[in-house]
């Protein structure tokens, strides 16, 4: 899988390589030798979002996982199952709904409502929403689902758009930047797509649940180096290198946590779209290390 689109919502797309095609000198010329690495980030998608209502200058808006940005656009993958948790008391008078238009036209395909663990019709859900202790909306996104919207059934203007993508990956709010992530935690591999912001020290969620040891980053919206951040096995410091350069490694600040990874060193500027391939070690499955050559 190679990044073949600059769209932020596309985590990755497959690109076909044809022998002898030349491809502008990039790949597959006759008599030339190439190496290819392929990783499986899983065939299905799913995530639970904690929904709250936040006051933005006097206007109530939904937020997800405490990400302090109003009216974000969600990316959900077709075939993926997503759970929206509205237990927080801020939701009590704001029944969270999904439809095919902003502030109306309820969408029904693949959606189930639960109040206090009991399945409800949409009418029962909205009527009993405020009195319930636990509130859930489950959606399994159908193939070829339309663009959807999330909104409050009582008050207009609280929600935003949901992009339903045929490519895998869904919105992640664990970092300072919203990202689109497809993760296979069992294999210790995550694909992270994001747009660079205008502040320093930006972070993105990776979904692995443990601290990664290496991340490979590349700008998708233009030419750039392949930036690599990694945990140096000799002293556990964080270093960086570039795949396409012969420069020695450099030192950088702490780059990985169990939930986030930093923007790749030297990857891009404000507004650039980036793809990251993030790896963690899995006992009995994968290990990262280093060696010193002896010239033999």
Where are these regions (language model features)?
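Single conserved hydrophobic/aromatic residue that forms the stacking wall/gate
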Residues: 1-8, 12-15
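Glycine-rich, low-complexity segments
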Residues: 36-50, 57, 165-190, 280-289
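Extracellular receptor-binding modules and their adjoining Ser/Thr/Gly/Asp/Asn-rich linkers
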Residues: 43, 182-200, 249-251, 255-296
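Short, structured beta-strand segments at or near domain termini in extracellular proteins/domains
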Residues: 31-41, 149-163, 174-175, 212-217, ...
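N-terminal edge beta-strand
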Residues: 54-77
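Extracellular/periplasmic metallocenter environments
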Residues: 51, 90-93, 115-168
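Surface-exposed ligand/attachment interfaces on beta-rich extracellular proteins
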Residues: 24-26, 67-75, 171, 175-177, ...
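Acidic glycine-/aspartate-rich tracts in secreted/extracellular proteins
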Residues: 41-45, 55-58, 87-92, 100-105, ...
């Amino acid at each position: 899988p190679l990044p073949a689109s600059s769209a932020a919502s596309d985590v990755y797309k497959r690109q076909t390589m044809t022998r002898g095609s030349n491809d502008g000198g990039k790949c597959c010329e006759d008599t030339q030798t190439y190496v290819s690495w392929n990783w499986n980030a899983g065939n299905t998608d799913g995530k639970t979002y904690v929904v709250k209502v936040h006051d933005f200058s006097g206007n109530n808006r939904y937020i997800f996982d405490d990400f302090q940005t109003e009216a974000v656009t969600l990316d959900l993958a077709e075939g993926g199952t997503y759970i929206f948790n509205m237990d927080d008391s801020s939701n009590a008078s704001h029944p969270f709904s999904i439809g095919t238009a902003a502030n109306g036209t309820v969408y029904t395909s693949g959606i189930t409502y639960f109040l206090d663990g009991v399945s409800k019709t949409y009418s029962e859900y909205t009527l009993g929403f405020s009195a319930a202790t636990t509130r859930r909306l489950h959606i399994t996104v159908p193939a070829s689902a339309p663009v959807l919207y999330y909104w409050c059934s009582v008050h207009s203007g609280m929600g935003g758009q949901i992009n339903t993508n045929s490519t895998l990956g869904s919105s992640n709010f664990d970092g300072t930047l919203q990202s689109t992530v497809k993760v296979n935690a069992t294999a210790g591999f995550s694909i992270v797509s994001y747009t660079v912001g205008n502040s320093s020290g930006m972070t993105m969620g990776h979904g692995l649940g443990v601290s990664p040891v290496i991340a490979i980053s590349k700008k998708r919206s233009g030419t750039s180096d392949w930036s690599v951040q990694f945990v140096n096995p000799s002293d556990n410091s964080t270093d960086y290198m570039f795949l396409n350069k012969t420069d020695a490694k450099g030192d950088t600040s702490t780059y990985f946590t169990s939930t986030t990874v930093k923007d790749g060193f030297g990857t891009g500027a404000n507004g650039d779209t980036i793809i990251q391939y993030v790896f963690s070690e899995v006992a009995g499955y994968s290990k990262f290390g280093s060696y010193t050559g002896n010239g033999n």
